[in-house]
Amino acid sequence: MSARTKARKRALDVLYVADIRGESIPATLAVEQQRAAAEPDRQASWAYAREIAEGFVEHQDEIDELIETYSVNWTLARMPAVDRAILRIGIWEILFNADVPDGVAISESVDLASSLSTDESASFVNGMLARIAAAQA
């Protein structure tokens, strides 16, 4: 597993935990940063995980508005928390990280959905992110 793939998973953990616990993302990031500092093998992926989470916080309103706009018959509040977190990461990478090709952002998000969410989530995430990427092109 590449360092960026691990970082996406760590960012997903941060967004998911903050969402489920009703905590702020910066507070959850602070806890994770302490954990990463204590475990050298986590430090390689930590910088990009933090960049993703902080980037989402900076652009949360825009990202969540896109999710609401492009999700058919699913409000943000109604979708599973893990799917919300995956979509937020994928959209942030598509819109705000020029170093990651859209196809890679979509593929990595679909892989996360396949391994961590429902059977239908991977195709839902794929369709949503593909439509958003196409609209931004």
Swiss-Prot record:
Any single Gene Ontology cellular-component annotation: cytosol
InterPro entries in UniProt: NusB-like_sf (IPR035926), NusB_fam (IPR011605), NusB_RsmB_TIM44 (IPR006027)
One annotated GO molecular function: RNA binding
Source superkingdom: Bacteria
The entry's keywords: RNA-binding, Transcription, Transcription antitermination, Transcription regulation
Gene3D superfamilies, per the entry: NusB-like
GO BP term, pick one: transcription antitermination
Matching SUPFAM superfamilies: NusB-like (SSF48013)
Coiled-coil parts of chain: none
Function in brief: Involved in transcription antitermination. Required for transcription of ribosomal RNA (rRNA) genes. Binds specifically to the boxA antiterminator sequence of the ribosomal RNA (rrn) operons.
Family membership: Belongs to the NusB family.
Record-linked PANTHER family: ANTITERMINATION NUSB DOMAIN-CONTAINING PROTEIN, N UTILIZATION SUBSTANCE PROTEIN B-RELATED
HAMAP family, A to Z: NusB
Annotated protein name in UniProt: Transcription antitermination protein NusB
